[in-house]
């Protein structure tokens, strides 16, 4: 990605307040919103609780690395196709999900990053979020949902 394109994506995300593309049922136990770079401290804090993920990446966790998740795009996609969602419970960030619509094809939604707060792992939180997201996407006529994961990371299996 060119530096110019990256900068324009970064500026758009900084100022863009967008509607959540997914409508979760009222019974869903989380409030879901589109995150912006102003939410970076909360996302960074959630990521700090998951050091094994970054160990498997062989990459130190920094605010810049987390910020890059907000702006990273796969080839051929633009910022209008990407949503970085936050799932909150009791005003606390419980999980984050990076969705790219129409990648790698028009019938697929790609989850490039998904992380659950360490205190909520192993309790079905991630499975609940993924299953509800899959149901909603299916109703929106998407046929596939691809979830990226780091090979060898037992937490993501």
Where are these regions (language model features)?
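Conserved beta-strand-loop-alpha-helix junction that forms the acyl-donor binding cleft
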Residues: 147-157
């Amino acid at each position: 990605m060119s530096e110019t394109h990256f900068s324009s994506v970064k500026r758009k995300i900084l100022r863009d307040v967008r509607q959540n593309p997914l409508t979760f049922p009222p019974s869903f136990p989380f409030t879901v919103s589109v995150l912006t770079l102003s939410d970076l401290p909360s996302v960074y804090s959630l990521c700090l609780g998951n050091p094994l993920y970054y160990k498997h990446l062989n990459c130190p966790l920094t605010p810049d690395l987390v910020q890059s998740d907000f702006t990273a795009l796969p080839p051929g996609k633009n910022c209008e196709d990407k949503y970085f969602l936050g799932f909150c419970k009791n005003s606390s960030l419980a999980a984050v999900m990076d969705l790219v619509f129409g990648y790698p094809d028009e019938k697929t939604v790609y989850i490039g990053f998904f992380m659950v707060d360490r205190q909520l792992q192993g309790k079905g939180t991630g499975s609940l979020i993924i299953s509800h997201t899959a149901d909603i996407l299916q109703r929106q006529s998407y046929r596939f949902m691809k979830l990226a994961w780091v090979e060898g990371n037992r937490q993501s299996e």
